[in-house]
Amino acid sequence: VGFFGCILSFIIYKCGTDWIDVVLPPAAMGPVVALIGLELSGSAADNAGLLADKVDPRNVIVFAVTLGVAIFGNILFRGFLSVIPILIAVIAGYVAALACGILDFSQVASASWFALPNFQMPKFDMGAIMMILPVLLVITSEHIGHQVVTSKIVGRDLLKKPGLHRSLFGDNFSTMISGLIGSVPTTTYGENIGVMAVTRVYSVRVIAGAAFLSIICSFVGKLSMLIQTIPGPVIGGISFLLYGMIGASGIRILVDSQVDYGLSRNLTLTSVVFVTGLSGIAVKFGDIELTGMVLACIVGMILSLVFYILDRLKLTNDREEA
């Protein structure tokens, strides 16, 4: 699947990215990007243990401490501290979790200092490849959405420089390498986009350095187990803010693009995309299920293309209103 993704990136390299403005205009792209954050908001609350039938008060305390430090740190911190509000919030939440007695260090004590990751030998299965291949469309849609919101955060059009074809190739080539060593496929993550929005650190070198340190840490068994002791309420508290910022970035696309909602097609497009993503509707094709942001993105692309054709044929009533 990663190989086919690399082929797709080559096709995009030859065809360019102008088609994105046709199939995903701002009236569709804005809500799609917003849905990336809004769709994940439920998982943030679930990680924090706030959706359980009986909510543990300790989880609420740890969640509130973490989220509070993240919010006010992002607003009040200056200088070097303004770069690491997320890290400080995690530490504050961890201390609160320790005080509340919800940490378990038993696995840290039993873990070895040096531990190799559990690699598996790859197995070539054409049936499995064909079953997962349709997911490539889903991954590509999500990748485009993530690139757009990242572009808004860093203030540079990443779809043009370095280019969608390069980022998509890197995404799929890394999936190939990951598969060859028996690991899981790689993909872009909204959480990391949220971290960039909060810290305002966009350096490729910093991100590459963090990736290198993560690889080194994976060989230190006790450190890996210590990281796993970070409780759900801490992760949920951080994610609550990060996912919200991604959602706000989608709204920012609509504002910056000055989308005219006096035009029927823009109002209809945004409305349908939002409701499709938030309604919980799911469409199944065999073992593949499309729902949430992915389904909304596909619906938005189809509608945008239809509206574009109708507009070119001068059949829309927006021309009369203009």
Regions found by a protein language model. Name each.
Residues 105-118, 153-159, 167, 306-322:
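Intrinsically disordered, low-complexity non-transmembrane regions of multi-pass membrane transporters
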Residues 1-104, 211, 216-318:
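Membrane-embedded alpha-helical modules
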Residues 134-204, 321:
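Membrane-embedded helical hairpins/re-entrant loop segments and their flanking transmembrane helices
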Residues 106, 112-114, 162, 179, ...:
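Flexible, active-site-adjacent loop/turn segments at secondary-structure boundaries
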Residues 117, 196, 277:
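Residues in well-ordered beta-strands of folded domains
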Residues 57-66, 84-85, 100, 117-148, ...:
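Hydrophobic, membrane-embedded alpha-helices of multi-pass small-molecule transporters
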